[in-house]
Amino acid sequence: MRDPVDTYMNYLIPMVVEQTNRGERSYDIFSRLLKERIIFLTGPVEDGMSTLAVAQLLFLEADNPKKEISMYINSPGGVVTSGLAIYDTMQFIKPAVSTLCIGQAASMGSLLLTAGEKDMRFALPNARIMVHQPSGGFQGQVTDIMLHAQEILNLKRRLNEIYVKHTGRSMDKIEDALERDNFMTAKAALDFGLIDAVIDQRPTDDTSKAA
């Protein structure tokens, strides 16, 4: 039986029809929003999602390197290296990237949320944010297991450094916060420094920005 979520993503994506001087032109809803410089990061962070996100970031930079990009995040997290590919691209490109959590930003999702441009990191009131240390498993020879364990420790240290950079918290505070699954409300994430504001509606004087 086909996964209902997979069915939704593949068959029920709305289309938008616009009138142009050359007649009608149709877009799927996500492509239309991409024209407005809006990127969606939804679902698990893995190589396929990461590749699409990086490609969209690079495309929007090429389109206009001075205009901000809005990234909407609703993700349970996923593969660390896939998330770091998105993170590095966000830091690499010229446009400022605004982030907004809708639903949840857990694990790597929370890191991408806090990686947005300073003063441009937001969450909706009922969003949930979760931070924790990386996890992994490996089978094989003892030496290989030890090497993989060391790599996980290296990744843990690097992720902690990223959280320190973007939250302004000390390394000790970050290590304590990430020791176990740490679930936060939007307000708690604001107090911790993961985001800059909790918003419940668009500013009345600017409806053009996505966040």
From Swiss-Prot:
One term under GO cellular component: endopeptidase Clp complex
UniProt cross-references to SUPFAM superfamilies, sorted A to Z: ClpP/crotonase
Compartments reported by the entry: Cytoplasm
GO MF entries: ATP-dependent peptidase activity; ATPase binding; serine-type endopeptidase activity
Pfam families: CLP_protease (PF00574)
Matching InterPro entries: ClpP (IPR001907), ClpP/crotonase-like_dom_sf (IPR029045), ClpP/TepA (IPR023562), ClpP_His_AS (IPR033135), ClpP_Ser_AS (IPR018215)
UniProt xrefs under PROSITE patterns: CLP_PROTEASE_HIS, CLP_PROTEASE_SER
Enzyme Commission numbers on file: 3.4.21.92
Active site: 107, 132
Keywords carried by this UniProt record: Cytoplasm, Hydrolase, Protease, Serine protease
Family of the protein in this entry: Belongs to the peptidase S14 family.
Oligomeric form and interacting partners: Fourteen ClpP subunits assemble into 2 heptameric rings which stack back to back to give a disk-like structure with a central cavity, resembling the structure of eukaryotic proteasomes.
NCBIfam families on file: PRK00277.1, PRK12553.1
UniProt name for this protein: ATP-dependent Clp protease proteolytic subunit
Organism, scientific name: Xanthobacter autotrophicus (strain ATCC BAA-1158 / Py2)
Lineage, top ranks: Bacteria, Pseudomonadati, Pseudomonadota, Alphaproteobacteria, Hyphomicrobiales
